[in-house]
């Protein structure tokens, strides 16, 4: 029952990775109940990072913890291989990658070859990152089954829990995480855990939910899921990936810098509106976890 944070990547106003803020955020998360950090995921703006930046995030976070799944996906296969090779210097939990995106009607054999190439170079366990909405390609359970001897786990960012369960039913030993914030409770109770972007600013809520589930207080855990959904609905109105940066400061009390285009920082009036709208939910959350 793992709570996995797809950790955001803090940037300066000039668009450089703020390594000190990244290190501090990683430490806070691990110290406050998060089990693993998913580095260079969607929330970390991984697809918009250079090869060098992806390695910088790994090096920075590794100074704090080795509880890391290192996402290396790219359309440049040479960059992917270089990152996988570089990971040999780090004692981490695993390597992950989304499939090649953009190119339509990609033959299944190309997809299999992509992940096989990573597995052949990787000294670590391999996790597949399935995000059909973003990549345009669904790595179904039947496709994953063909790679079952190569991989350890899978992150399925999908609003359909039954889709995630298909992997677990077909491959019981595969570690399966759902990546939807609205399904954290169901992922913790039905799968191996949840990769939840909201845990960047609500780690205490995720920790409390896990405690409720473990102690059999299911109704209390469901109430926390409802509060997560409220926060999620508000953040989406302003652009969820950008809003997370401001919500970390609001809920946790420290600065994590800015996002970077094409995920642009919010305008000042948007920040004020976001923080104003989140206040009632924040109070509900404080009461629920106290």
Swiss-Prot record:
Entry's pH dependence statement = Optimum pH is 5.5.
Ligand binding (substrate): 42-43, 129-131, 155-157
- The annotated site for Proton shuttle falls at 129
Relate the activity to temperature as described in the entry: Optimum temperature is around 90 degrees Celsius. Extremely thermostable.
Q: Which GO terms describe its molecular function?
A: 2-dehydro-3-deoxy-6-phosphogalactonate aldolase activity; 2-dehydro-3-deoxy-phosphogluconate aldolase activity; 4-hydroxy-tetrahydrodipicolinate synthase activity
Q: EC number(s) of the enzyme?
A: 4.1.2.55
* Signal sequence extent: none
- Quickly give the catalysed reaction: 2-dehydro-3-deoxy-6-phospho-D-gluconate = D-glyceraldehyde 3-phosphate + pyruvate; 2-dehydro-3-deoxy-6-phospho-D-galactonate = D-glyceraldehyde 3-phosphate + pyruvate
Q: Which domain of life is it from?
A: Archaea
The record's listing under Pfam families reads: DHDPS
Question: Catalytic site residues?
Answer: 155
- Coiled-coil segments, which residues? none
Q: Pathway involvement?
A: Carbohydrate acid metabolism; 2-dehydro-3-deoxy-D-gluconate degradation; D-glyceraldehyde 3-phosphate and pyruvate from 2-dehydro-3-deoxy-D-gluconate: step 2/2
Q: Which UniProt keywords apply?
A: Carbohydrate metabolism, Lyase, Schiff base
> Cross-referenced NCBIfam families, in alphabetical order?
Arch_KDGaldase
Quaternary state and interactors: Homotetramer; dimer of dimers.
What family, per the record? Belongs to the DapA family. KDPG aldolase subfamily.
Described function = Involved in the degradation of glucose and galactose via the Entner-Doudoroff pathway. Catalyzes the reversible cleavage of 2-keto-3-deoxy-6-phosphogluconate (KDPG) and 2-keto-3-deoxygluconate (KDG) forming pyruvate and glyceraldehyde 3-phosphate or glyceraldehyde, respectively. It is also able to catalyze the reversible cleavage of 2-keto-3-deoxy-6-phosphogalactonate (KDPGal) and 2-keto-3-deoxygalactonate (KDGal).
Its name, as the record gives it, is: 2-dehydro-3-deoxy-phosphogluconate/2-dehydro-3-deoxy-6-phosphogalactonate aldolase
Source organism: Sulfurisphaera tokodaii (strain DSM 16993 / JCM 10545 / NBRC 100140 / 7) (Sulfolobus tokodaii)
């Amino acid at each position: 029952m793992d709570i996995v944070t797809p950790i955001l990547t803090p940037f300066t106003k000039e668009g450089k990775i703020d390594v000190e803020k990244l290190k501090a955020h990683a430490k806070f998360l691990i110290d406050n109940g998060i089990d693993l950090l998913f580095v260079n995921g969607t929330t970390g703006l991984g697809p918009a990072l250079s090869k060098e930046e992806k390695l910088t995030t790994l090096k920075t976070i590794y100074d704090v913890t080795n509880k890391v799944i290192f996402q290396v996906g790219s359309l440049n296969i040479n960059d992917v291989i270089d990152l996988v090779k570089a990971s040999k210097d780090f004692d981490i939990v695993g390597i992950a990658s989304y499939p090649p995106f953009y190119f339509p009607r990609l033959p299944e054999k190309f997809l299999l070859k992509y992940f096989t190439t990573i597995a052949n170079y990787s000294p670590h366990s391999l996790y597949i990152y399935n995000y059909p909405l973003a990549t345009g390609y669904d790595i179904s359970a039947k496709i994953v089954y063909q790679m079952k001897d190569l991989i350890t786990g899978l992150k399925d960012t999908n609003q359909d829990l039954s889709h995630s369960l298909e992997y677990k039913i077909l491959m019981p030993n595969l570690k399966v995480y759902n990546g939807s914030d609205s399904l954290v409770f169901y992922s913790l109770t039905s799968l191996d855990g949840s990769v939840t972007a909201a845990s960047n600013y609500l780690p205490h809520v995720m920790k409390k939910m896990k405690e409720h589930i473990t102690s059999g207080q299911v109704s209390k855990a469901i109430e926390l899921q409802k509060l997560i959904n409220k926060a999620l609905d508000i953040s989406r109105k302003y652009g969820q990936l950008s809003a997370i940066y401001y919500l970390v400061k609001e809920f946790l009390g420290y600065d994590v810098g800015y996002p970077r285009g094409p995920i642009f920082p919010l305008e000042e009036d948007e920040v004020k509106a976001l923080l104003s709208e989140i206040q009632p939910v924040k109070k509900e959350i404080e009461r629920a976890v106290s």
